[in-house]
Amino acid sequence: MNILFVHQNCPGQYKHLAPALAARKGWDVRFLTRPGKPDVAGVTKAEYDLAREPGKQTHRYLTNLESAVLYGQAAAQAAEKMRQSGFVPDVIVGHAGWGETMYLKDVFPTARLLGYFEFYYRAYGSDVDFELDRKVTLDDRARIRTKNAAQFISLEAADWGVTPTLWQKAQLPREFHGKVSVIHEGFDTDIVKPLADAKVTLPSGVKLTKDDEVVTYVARNLEPYRGFPIFMQVAEEICRRRPNAHILIVGADGVSYGRSLPDGQTYREKALSEVEIDPARVHFLGRQPYEQYLTVLQISAVHVYLTYPFVLSWSMLEAMGCECLIVGSDTPPVREVIRDGENGLLVDFYDHLAIADRVDEVLDHDDRMAEIRKRARRTIERSYSLDKCLRDQIRMVENLAEGRRPGNVAVVPPAGQKAVGKSGTQRKKRGAGRTRAPAAAKRRG
């Protein structure tokens, strides 16, 4: 069996799947990627590079499409060299987000294509119209529709698609739902687990354990899409209410999604100019090595996870795997996993006082939260463990290699989950919910 993986940032979502297939006797597994990416055990790596960047005069609606065409062209040219050398894949497995999969079936017409579809953009019911007071214009709608062009081409070309959550599937055009399965990549629950004697020593020398009031927040970058400005208002309130609480913030100062601030200002700098916190108890840890990051989760008394309707962060699932008590935003990606009061707590994304109230609820009644923590862990073991997810991924590749299609194979959603539509996005008008107390009143409190 010949398998070709394609991802510009090897191994990407295929960290476990590629070596698992390569370990099979008689399977020839190749990986097509950009130069300088890591090797994968048992996998033969091939590289491509872009001929150029999108042109400066390109219409801004078309910048993403031109970039995708350049990626697709480069990947196809590299694939053609592989074909000329005698390698013809039975199955191609590739991420559709950058355009690499658009033309691969033109090189290998007999191959079956399994596409990974991470996020299909929508003007409404998703991230764009979630921002308070943002008016979605005709320009926005046209730009977003065009932004999906490369994914649409890849969707049409794919024999089978996969996406990690039901909500992400719901964003895809309905006519393609029949050939898209929902399978998460999963992670190792023997590593991501609670640890009773976990301890974090901060740069200041302060040592924290599970016995302390530790509130955690994690994001790749500290930015609005992951609720960072809201969380800083929560941090201010926690500092005022709870003199013994420590707040650990993991994440860098860049922008992964959305817009950057003018003049190079970071969202952390902006937030610190707007709130009053105790710097001795609010700790910015930056990005952490994976083991240290897990230790932060393992000592957490409350983990706050906020997100726009967008791709669900692994950090929330890993926090649940560590038996963290999640206080999460009541937005569709979070609701798909967390049921309020059962395996976590949900709250209005924009209501910082309600979020602080739920943090108080957990810290004041930790004895009542033990079963919620355990159910959070069980949710992960049942639906997101690497053992289960990798087994499902391998079965999907095998089915595709044997000529089956999603319509011929029963795909069971993760346990306890229900289909999530595009509606129901939580978005409130400014002024809805409670307002912040005046600073002077808070200081008197």
Where are these regions (language model features)?
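Conserved acidic donor-binding segment of nucleotide-sugar-dependent glycosyltransferases
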Residues: 340-341, 345-352, 361-366
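A short, well-ordered alpha-helix in the C-terminal region of glycosyltransferases
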Residues: 354, 361, 368-383, 389-395
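Aromatic "clamp/platform" in nucleotide-sugar-dependent glycosyltransferases that forms part
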Residues: 308
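N-terminal subdomain of nucleotide-sugar transferases
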Residues: 1-44, 427-429, 441-445
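Nucleotide-activated donor-binding/catalytic signature segment of Leloir-type glycosyltransferases, i.e.
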Residues: 251, 255, 260-287
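Short hydrophobic beta-strand element within catalytic cores of glycosyltransferases
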Residues: 325-328
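Acceptor-binding helix/loop patch of EC 2.4 sugar-transfer enzymes
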Residues: 52-62, 110-149, 190-199, 252-262, ...
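Conserved donor-binding/catalytic core segment of Leloir-type glycosyltransferases
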Residues: 203-226, 232-237, 247-248
